[in-house]
Structure formats: C-alpha cells, structure tokens
Amino acid sequence: MTKMDHKIVKTSYDGDAVSVEWDGGASAKFDNIWLRDNCHCSECYYDATKQRLLNSCSIPDDIAPIKVDSSPTKLKIVWNHEEHQSEYECRWLVIHSYNPRQIPVTEKVSGEREILAREYWTVKDMEGRLPSVDFKTVMASTDENEEPIKDWCLKIWKHGFCFIDNVPVDPQETEKLCEKLMYIRPTHYGGFWDFTSDLSKNDTAYTNIDISSHTDGTYWSDTPGLQLFHLLMHEGTGGTTSLVDAFHCAEILKKEHPESFELLTRIPVPAHSAGEEKVCIQPDIPQPIFKLDTNGELIQVRWNQSDRSTMDSWENPSEVVKFYRAIKQWHKIISDPANELFYQLRPGQCLIFDNWRCFHSRTEFTGKRRMCGAYINRDDFVSRLNLLNIGRQPVLDAI
C-alpha cells in the first residue's frame, strides 16, 4: 500500500488549521484559507476547464470551519462565511499535503518516476541501439490510436534524441512530421526552415564552417525544447553531426569537480543573437549553464560558446578565473570521444533531439548542402509526453 492509498482515520481543528490523520499514522495540517481557496465545488471551480472560479483575494481573513466531518475517503467542511460547504478527497489531500509533505514533490504524479526514467548514455552505450521510429508508422497515428506518438515521445525523453527513418526527401512531408508531434515554434529564423549555407540568415548555422557542441537559443528567455533536422541534399564531403548527452557529462563534472559544477549552477551567462540588422535578442535574465529545479535536480543545460556575450557583471570578481577553469573542465568532458557520438545524417532520415539535454555539432563541409527542420516548445512536448505515457488522470490529480 502506498501513502496515496491510505484512509482518513481522524480529523481535528485547532482554530487556524485542520489536521488530518491517516491510517498509516501520518498526519498533516492544512491552513483554513488554503483549504477554502482549494474548494472544488461548482461555485468555486470550473471542472470542465480545470480552472478556479473563486477569487482568492475575496476570502475573509477570519475564515474558519463551523463543522468538520470526515469519512475514510473524504474530508467535509462547512465554513463560517455563507455556510459554504467544501469536500476534499483523501487522495487529493495526501498528494497536496505541505505541513508536512506526505509524498515527495517528484512523486506527485503517480508513475512518473518509473515510466519517464531517463537513460543517460555514452557512445559505447549507443552501439547498435540508436533509438528510432518509422515515418509511416508515426504518420498513421490517429486520435483513436496514438501509440506511435507515445512511443516516439518516450524515446526522445529517455535518450534525449531519436531518429525517424524512411522519411520522404521532401520539406513539406518533413514539416507534416513536425506538426504530427506538436506545433512548430516560429522565431526570427521563421517557422519551418529550409536552408543552405548561403548566409541567408547571419548565423554560423547558415555557413559551412565547423560548429562545436552546443545547444540552440541560449539567447532566448525560453530556449527551444526540441529541434528536428532533415538533410535533404549534400553534394560534397564532411558535415558530420555529433550528439552529446550533457546530463551524463554533468554527472561526471559533479563527481570529479564538484566545486566547478556548483559554480556553473550559479554564474549567469549572458547571450545574444545579433547577426541580423534588425535583430538583437537577449534573455531578460541571463541564466547559468546548469539549471536546477527546486529539488536540486538538473533540468537544463545551456551551452553555446558562439552566442555567449561579454561577461562583465560579476558579483564576486574572484570567481572570474574559477569560471574559466570550470568551463575548461566541462569542455574536456563533453569533447571526450567516449561522450561525443558522431553520425552522418542522410536524406530520408530525420533527427530530433532534446535541446535542453543533448548538445549537437557539425563538422566543416564542402559543396552544396540543403537542410530543413524546426523548433518545438518544451512545454508543449512535455504535456503530450505526460498525457500519453502517464495518463491524463494522474497528471490532473497533481495540479
């Protein structure tokens, strides 16, 4: 039995909060105003859209229960203002308990940790097992049968990238593939791109020079979540793509140089995109290379040597030399042949990858090369990933 399955055995009220005790012996307090704010009756909550109707600022300061009742599966309260009645499911109280928490935040969505467990990798790990899906199978997915999209999303999430085989060598079909997954994100590069190395946009991606491992969009406040490439044509040599599992590399840095890892979670790194005459994009707030969530877990790596701006806003000038030492240690790890997977893209095969996790690069090339692709927002992708792989109800239970 998990904590989510426990039943209510006792409730009490001490004036400012309601206490709930479960059959496992655990208990938690819930403030009066918090409980009133989270009433899910039809007057306070629009169930069809999962949105609050109650104006939280209208709740009186002296809000208090005049009656508290419970069953094994439900808490019932009658409030002193307008004798409003509220009910709270036992499972909901366990999931959202906060004083103290009954379950870790990372376990609020039932099954998430197990189903969406990531697999960090090295080059050796990927030998003979590159994740892939088939174009026709994915495109045949329907609202009634989304298993192919479910599988595709999970492979992208688990490994940080996925190939799509047997794609028509046609930009229009590639665009349809992107839209089958999620909405395409428009930027100053356009929505769906179709480009050659003609510098039609003043960015190194539109040249034939070597581009080292990086993530895209460090100059945006909201960096793209996914990126898809399709090499439509190449009449020449070179242009090999590489992928690096930056999350795996971050674990190495944290183990070998913990002080450098910690530094790179704090030092903000400014970035810009200013190649176009009418464009100079910079994030509202510069972000560190490693972004951690509230539990200290790594959720994003931002790394782009080309787009880094002049770093002149040091809170502690003594950290300047430490920063450069840290990124040198970091660069050594991500450039290790054991961690950098090189792959020759080819017409008819797309590559999609997690731009928050995987670095990509491209070696210098000769001849004419035509590429198409698109960005997809992370929030949109994660929403579809969760709903298809975990299920709508467990996700809704946690909001």
From Swiss-Prot:
<comment type="similarity">
    <text>Belongs to the gamma-BBH/TMLD family.</text>
</comment>
<dbReference type="InterPro" id="IPR038492">
    <property type="entry name" value="GBBH-like_N_sf"/>
</dbReference>
<feature type="binding site">
    <location>
        <position position="214"/>
    </location>
    <ligand>
        <name>Fe cation</name>
    </ligand>
</feature>
<comment type="function">
    <text>Converts trimethyllysine (TML) into hydroxytrimethyllysine (HTML).</text>
</comment>
<dbReference type="InterPro" id="IPR010376">
    <property type="entry name" value="GBBH-like_N"/>
</dbReference>
<dbReference type="GO" id="GO:0005739">
    <property type="term" value="C:mitochondrion"/>
</dbReference>
<feature type="binding site">
    <location>
        <position position="216"/>
    </location>
    <ligand>
        <name>Fe cation</name>
    </ligand>
</feature>
<keyword id="KW-0408">Iron</keyword>
<keyword id="KW-0124">Carnitine biosynthesis</keyword>
<feature type="binding site">
    <location>
        <position position="360"/>
    </location>
    <ligand>
        <name>Fe cation</name>
    </ligand>
</feature>
<keyword id="KW-0560">Oxidoreductase</keyword>
<dbReference type="InterPro" id="IPR012776">
    <property type="entry name" value="Trimethyllysine_dOase"/>
</dbReference>
<dbReference type="GO" id="GO:0045329">
    <property type="term" value="P:carnitine biosynthetic process"/>
</dbReference>
<comment type="pathway">
    <text>Amine and polyamine biosynthesis; carnitine biosynthesis.</text>
</comment>
<dbReference type="Pfam" id="PF02668">
    <property type="entry name" value="TauD"/>
</dbReference>
<protein>
    <recommendedName>
        <fullName>Trimethyllysine dioxygenase</fullName>
        <ecNumber>1.14.11.8</ecNumber>
    </recommendedName>
</protein>
<dbReference type="Pfam" id="PF06155">
    <property type="entry name" value="GBBH-like_N"/>
</dbReference>
<keyword id="KW-0223">Dioxygenase</keyword>
<keyword id="KW-0479">Metal-binding</keyword>
<dbReference type="InterPro" id="IPR042098">
    <property type="entry name" value="TauD-like_sf"/>
</dbReference>
<dbReference type="InterPro" id="IPR003819">
    <property type="entry name" value="TauD/TfdA-like"/>
</dbReference>
<dbReference type="InterPro" id="IPR050411">
    <property type="entry name" value="AlphaKG_dependent_hydroxylases"/>
</dbReference>
<dbReference type="GO" id="GO:0005506">
    <property type="term" value="F:iron ion binding"/>
</dbReference>
<dbReference type="GO" id="GO:0050353">
    <property type="term" value="F:trimethyllysine dioxygenase activity"/>
</dbReference>
<keyword id="KW-0963">Cytoplasm</keyword>
